[in-house]
Curated annotation (Swiss-Prot):
GO terms for cellular component: plasma membrane. This is Vomeronasal type-1 receptor 50. The chain crosses the membrane at residues 17-37, 51-71, 94-114, 135-155, 194-214, 238-258, 270-290. Residues 38-50, 115-134, 215-237, 291-310 are cytoplasmic. The keyword Lipoprotein does not apply. It is a multi-pass membrane protein. Putative pheromone receptor implicated in the regulation of social and reproductive behavior. PROSITE patterns: G_PROTEIN_RECEP_F1_2. Disulfide bonds join C85-C172. InterPro entries: GPCR_Rhodpsn_7TM, Vmron_rcpt_1. It holds the Pfam family V1R.
Length: 310
């Protein structure tokens, strides 16, 4: 079989990947539960809480799916059939795309929410949840269509000696795809991702400019020293910038590893490193929300206190 078959013998990669998935599932579960409680207990729940809850459940499903795929990569208990391979890998690819999309739309919604009344975005404040929902539904259909080729190209691996397939797990492989088809799919994915990253960059830049103007006006109006405590706007801005910076860095690393993997003909180490990097955002992004939200900090602290007392 291909070198990818040696994955199950690499204990370091196995431990790293399963640790990442476990931490990510725990963090996203906490983030989802906290914002679900907010939505259920508040009289007028904020749209941003709804989208953070959705963002966390999408990442949670992504990591659970990755965990199932990782089991077949490192600890195969039995061969999957083609239907199982196609369903899980298609769902995983779809959830990765939706996580990308949810990150972008959450960034845009936060920008609209933080914009002042004098801003040109004020008219979108009441309509933004509906527009964001419509945009997400559109991207969901788009990602489903982009990933539909996997339902044909993914098969169960029956011939363990063939070098013509690109091995995904011990049970699943990808059929060879023509160069023209690969080029078309790559171009479409690049355009889609460039658009979303550009939208994230614009919204993040807009928030930074707004915050800078706000601080400048505050210094002008109050000559006395300002409070050292960060305002909700400042905490929200730092959250946006941290998420944006973390996302871009991991996206660049993921692209570099992907190109290296193609150059070195699917070396198992590059394959596994790419998987770890491509799921790092889903694992660690919840901690950005947890560390920048007072409600989240109180919830986690009280929960840890109860566990210690037990």
């Amino acid at each position: 079989m291909s070198k990818a078959n040696l994955l199950h013998t690499d204990n370091n990669m196995k431990i790293t990947l399963f640790s990442e998935v476990s931490v990510g599932i725990s963090a996203n579960s906490i983030l989802f539960v906290v914002h679900l409680c907010k939505l259920l207990h508040e009289n007028k729940p904020k749209p941003i809480d709804l989208y953070i809850a959705f963002f966390s459940i999408t990442q949670l499903m992504l990591l659970i799916t990755m965990g199932l795929i990782a089991v077949d990569m490192f600890m195969p208990w039995g061969r999957w059939d083609s239907t199982t391979c196609q369903s899980l890998i298609y769902l995983h690819r779809l959830l990765r795309g939706l996580t990308f999309c949810a990150t972008c739309l959450l960034n845009v919604l936060w920008t609209i929410t933080l914009s002042p009344r004098s801003s040109c975005l004020t008219k979108f404040k009441h309509k933004s949840p509906h527009h964001i929902s419509g945009a997400f539904l559109f991207f969901c259909v788009l990602y489903m269509s982009f990933s539909s080729h996997l339902l044909v190209s993914i098969i169960a691996t029956f011939n363990s000696t063939s070098d013509n397939f690109l091995y995904v797990t011990q049970s699943c492989s990808i059929l060879p795809v023509s160069y023209s088809r690969t080029s078309i799919l790559s171009t479409m994915m690049t355009m889609r991702e460039a658009f979303l990253i550009g939208l994230m960059a614009l919204s993040s830049g807009y928030v930074v400019v707004l915050l800078w103007r706000h601080k400048k006006q505050a210094r002008h109006l109050h000559s006395t020293s300002l409070s050292s405590k960060a305002s909700p706007e400042q905490r929200a801005t730092s959250t946006i910038m941290l998420l944006m910076g973390f996302f871009v860095v991991l996206y660049i690393l993921d692209t570099v590893i992907f190109q290296a993997r193609l150059k070195f003909k699917d070396v198992s180490t590059f394959f596994c490193v790419k998987i770890i990097i491509s799921h790092s955002y889903a694992t660690f992004s919840p901690f950005v929300f947890i560390c920048n939200d007072k409600y989240m900090i109180k919830f986690v602290t009280s929960m840890c206190g109860r566990i210690v007392n037990v």
